[in-house]
């Protein structure tokens, strides 16, 4: 449909009028026999004339509808499809599902023809697939994988009217076992399930919440909680609060503020406490027994076995695009089996060991003409890296280590 407009006249550089007047005065003062000069600085006036403006014919304009995102990795989105993924018979005879089963079921989702299996919505599993794969690929952690799987099944079946209020969690385990990594995955899962409005993780050490004077701790704690709305608040190093026999005024402010917000802001954020199980009980829950009941889930990460330590070392080597000497794999495995107790911080210690091993390797091959052996770690590299690792950890005697197995 057309709409008519009055002709629009627009003048650009209206200051040309004043320039014209000035130039005219100057020309009058010129001598009669002098050639008239042309003012090259004068800008021309430009006029735009629009007779009418025409709108697009909206009645004939095609509208584009964006289809919803489908998370099915084998889905063709066809309501008449003949290639719907087949659910294996094994699932009909199962009485208990594990993490592998949930991942497999998520891969069988079809947005038109296969949306549910029994009481489980397959689309939600399809959405969670990448996060579940990430969790499943972690080395060890069998106990926590089983616990998270049970939690997921409960929430997937929508049996809880207010699931956001039930997600406060305790993750216990020694340093270096991967608590932070598990927290990241949990936050990712809760976000994809719609329980969080953002994936933000706010990690706070409890001693950072204790103020410099009485009345200062509560605002610090409240600020940390407010910054976690829509995401996850992680409270680490709970032993900083103090033991059950002694609770100062600063620590009491922190605990009371946390407890109050778990009620007043229920469902608006998830609180996760990380640390040793004994420390969490004695230094946190012992001060306020009401707190314990607010944390419905308690996940434990066990210490790593020697074989798992080797797998962690091997994985870190591969992630850095290095290699282990294939001819010495068994000897390297034995090294971790006989020195497992020398890595009390597990993953952290393995990372440090790998760094010193790389340094030892570079010094060993510095004059080596065979570039094909570069970045291939052998037992000697690990032995020398381990010696440096132990020295940095203030170990005084190599006799404490089982180097006889090197």
From Swiss-Prot:
Pfam family, one: AAA
Skewed-composition ranges (Low complexity): 13-32
GO molecular function, one term: ATP binding
Keywords of this entry: ATP-binding, Nucleotide-binding
Superkingdom: Viruses
InterPro entries linked to this entry: ATPase_AAA_core (IPR003959), CbxX/CfxQ (IPR000641), CbxX/CfxQ_RuBisCO_ESX (IPR050773), P-loop_NTPase (IPR027417)
Region (Disordered): 1-37
Annotated residues for binding of ATP: 173-180
Similarity annotation: Belongs to the CbxX/CfxQ family.
Protein name (database record): Putative cfxQ-like protein R730
Annotated source species: Acanthamoeba polyphaga mimivirus
Lineage of the organism: Viruses, Varidnaviria, Bamfordvirae, Nucleocytoviricota, Megaviricetes
């Amino acid at each position: 449909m057309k709409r008519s407009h009055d002709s629009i006249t627009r003048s650009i550089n209206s200051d040309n009028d004043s320039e014209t007047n000035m130039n005219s005065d100057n020309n009058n003062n010129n001598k009669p026999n002098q050639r008239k000069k042309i003012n090259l600085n004068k800008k021309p006036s430009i006029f735009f004339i629009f007779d009418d403006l025409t709108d697009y014919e909206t009645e004939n304009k095609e509208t584009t509808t964006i289809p919803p995102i489908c998370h099915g990795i084998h889905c063709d989105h066809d309501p008449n499809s003949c290639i719907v993924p087949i659910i294996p018979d094994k699932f009909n005879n199962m009485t208990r599902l594990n993490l592998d089963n949930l991942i497999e079921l998520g891969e069988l989702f079809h947005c038109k023809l296969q949306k549910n299996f029994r009481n489980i919505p397959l689309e939600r599993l399809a959405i969670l697939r990448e996060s579940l794969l990430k969790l499943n690929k972690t080395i060890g952690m069998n106990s926590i994988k089983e616990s998270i799987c049970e939690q997921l099944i409960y929430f997937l079946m929508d049996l809880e009217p207010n699931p956001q209020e039930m997600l406060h969690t305790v993750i216990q385990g020694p340093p270096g076992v991967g608590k932070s990594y598990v927290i990241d995955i949990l936050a990712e899962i809760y976000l994809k399930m719609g329980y969080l409005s953002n994936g933000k993780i706010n990690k706070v050490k409890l001693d950072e919440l204790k103020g410099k004077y009485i009345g200062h701790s509560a605002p610090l704690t409240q600020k940390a909680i407010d910054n976690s709305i829509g995401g996850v608040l992680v409270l680490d190093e709970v032993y900083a609060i103090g033991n059950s026999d002694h609770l100062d005024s600063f620590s009491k402010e922190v605990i009371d503020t946390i407890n109050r917000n778990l009620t007043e802001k229920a469902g608006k954020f998830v609180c996760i406490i990380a640390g040793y199980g004994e420390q969490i009980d004695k230094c946190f829950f012992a001060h306020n027994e009401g707190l314990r009941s607010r944390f419905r889930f308690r996940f434990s990460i066990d210490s790593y076995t020697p074989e798992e330590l080797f797998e962690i070392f091997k994985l870190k080597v591969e992630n850095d695009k290095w290699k282990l000497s294939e001819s010495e794999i068994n000897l390297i495995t034995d090294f971790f089996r006989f020195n497992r107790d020398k890595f009390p911080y597990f993953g952290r210690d393995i990372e440090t060991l790998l760094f010193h091993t790389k340094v030892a390797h570079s010094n060993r091959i510095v004059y080596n003409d065979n570039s094909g052996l570069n970045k291939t770690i052998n037992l000697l590299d690990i032995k020398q890296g381990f010696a440096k690792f132990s020295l940095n950890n203030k170990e005084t005697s190599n006799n404490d280590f089982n180097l006889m197995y090197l």
